[in-house]
Swiss-Prot record:
Transmembrane segments: none
GO molecular function: DNA binding
A Pfam family recorded for this sequence: GapR_DNA-bd
Signal peptide feature range: none
Coiled-coil intervals, chain numbering: none
The protein's name: UPF0335 protein BMEI0289
InterPro entries: GapR-like, GapR-like_DNA-bd
Family indicated by similarity: Belongs to the UPF0335 family.
Length: 92
């Protein structure tokens, strides 16, 4: 082997080491975030249990939260379609 091959092998090895380190860092970040997501999910469940214990309907609250995430025009369009379908089925 000549010196060019040795240098090339060293660069390749170093690049692989860096890539493995980056991959490991990404995976560890994702794992930490997944754990945080689980913790937040557990916290949200506790809040729903508290509101249910206070006499509120958790299903209705979930609907309100879903609707609040939408733009006004999206929500109004959805409500209009719902009303149209209910009228068509004689449900209003």
């Amino acid at each position: 082997m000549n010196w060019r091959n040795l240098v090339s092998d060293d660069i390749t090895s170093e690049a692989q080491t860096i890539a493995v380190g980056q991959l490991r860092a990404f995976i560890e970040r994702i794992e930490r975030l997944e754990e945080e997501k689980k913790t937040i999910g557990d916290d949200i469940k506790e809040v729903y249990a508290e509101l249910k214990g206070s006499g509120f309907d958790s299903k209705v609250v979930r609907t309100i939260i879903r609707l609040r995430k939408k733009e006004d025009h999206e929500r109004q369009e959805e409500e209009a379609m719902l009303q149209l379908y209910m009228d068509a089925l004689g449900m209003s």
